[in-house]
């Protein structure tokens, strides 16, 4: 699979970057529509977006570099080679929440309304961005037989044929799962849920899928013998459950009063 889409004056434009940009643009468009549901000033939301986007990318890269320090410590000049891949979703999500919280305070936005607004936008961008891994021939699973991979479209078969072997298209599994989560979040948006519930459900549903899919991958970021994505996913699942229970208990108490 050729990771380069085209060249402009000798500069390679890679599919990875194109798909990341596409995900960001579509997520921004969805945020515009959802800002009306939550009565959020879109100019203020754009201010949050302008700050959170670069900070999230920085955190996504930093997270990836830290857990691949054996390589980047020996090749520090490669730390900036983002267009070749190497953005960790969990790092980006953590960066987005931190910067989003700080900006919500600065622009006087309700933080829970903000994260409920953007939760489906996150998962939409993730679903699209995963295809960048496909073109980079990364984030795939272990070796599978031709009988297994033959159930997939031909272009997936070709893309997952690497160095003489076929591999699990884990990027595809996660992209499909993310689309399912997106549909769920959009369907429950207008339900009478406590503030923050959409985001908490995003944490739970996304992390459930990521936990199981990560177990198939061969290039997981590791901390000793632990797959970091699975550890963080478990933390997010537990945190999401606690927060959604707490917020709905608080919501019922407020309603009774």
Curated annotation (Swiss-Prot):
UniProt keyword list: Cell membrane, Membrane, Transferase, Transmembrane, Transmembrane helix
EC number: 2.5.1.145
Pfam assignment, any one: LGT
Pathway field: Protein modification; lipoprotein biosynthesis (diacylglyceryl transfer)
Any single GO BP term: lipoprotein biosynthetic process
Residues annotated as transmembrane: 8-28, 48-68, 84-104, 109-129, 169-189, 196-216, 225-245
UniProt function note: Catalyzes the transfer of the diacylglyceryl group from phosphatidylglycerol to the sulfhydryl group of the N-terminal cysteine of a prolipoprotein, the first step in the formation of mature lipoproteins.
Record-stated family: Belongs to the Lgt family.
Name of the protein this chain belongs to: Phosphatidylglycerol--prolipoprotein diacylglyceryl transferase
Species per Swiss-Prot/TrEMBL record: Clostridium novyi (strain NT)
Protein's gene: lgt
């Amino acid at each position: 699979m050729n990771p380069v889409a085209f060249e402009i004056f000798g500069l390679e434009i890679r599919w990875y970057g194109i798909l990341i940009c596409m995900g960001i643009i579509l997520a921004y468009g969805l945020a515009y529509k959802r800002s009306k549901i939550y009565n959020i000033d879109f100019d203020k939301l754009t201010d949050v977006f302008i700050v959170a986007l670069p900070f999230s990318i920085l955190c996504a890269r930093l997270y990836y570099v830290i857990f691949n320090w054996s390589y980047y410590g020996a090749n520090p000049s490669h730390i900036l080679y983002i267009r070749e891949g190497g953005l960790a979703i969990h790092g980006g999500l953590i960066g987005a929440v931190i910067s989003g919280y700080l900006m919500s305070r600065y622009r006087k936005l309700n933080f829970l309304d903000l994260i409920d607004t953007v939760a489906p936008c996150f998962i939409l961008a993730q679903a699209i961005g995963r295809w960048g891994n496909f073109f980079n021939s990364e984030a795939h699973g272990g070796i599978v037989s031709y009988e297994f991979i033959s159930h997939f479209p031909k272009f997936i078969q070709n893309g997952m044929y690497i160095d003489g072997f076929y591999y699990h298209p884990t990027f595809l599994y996660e992209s499909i799962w993310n689309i399912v989560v997106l549909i769920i979040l959009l369907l429950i948006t207008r339900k009478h849920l406590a503030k923050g519930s959409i985001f908490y459900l995003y944490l739970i549903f996304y992390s459930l899928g990521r936990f199981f899919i990560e177990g198939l991958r061969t290039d997981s970021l590791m901390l000793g013998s632990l797959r970091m994505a699975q550890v963080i996913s478990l933390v997010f699942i537990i945190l999401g459950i606690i927060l959604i229970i707490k917020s709905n208990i608080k919501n019922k108490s407020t309603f009774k009063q």
